[in-house]
């Protein structure tokens, strides 16, 4: 997909977040001073990441039930490997966990990002 077309798709995704993605985004965008910055529906290479923290080189993916199917597992592994080659770690969180406690899920994402930032220094 060309960069311009991918950016257009990412913009459309930003306007149509899933419910768990929206709940996380509302918490991540209202971060405290000193917390890492996250981008939503961030295009990188051939992919669009649910959330991306550039300081931590951390991709956060919110996985629904479809991510347990064999074909999707293989696609996710291929994507994770491609990102790892670029130095980007993928952290996957189940959508049901976000629905159960979005605050805890968002805090967990921030902690993972902070740990990764500290380890990169």
Stretches with model-predicted labels:
Residues 1-121:
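Nucleic-acid endo/exonuclease domains
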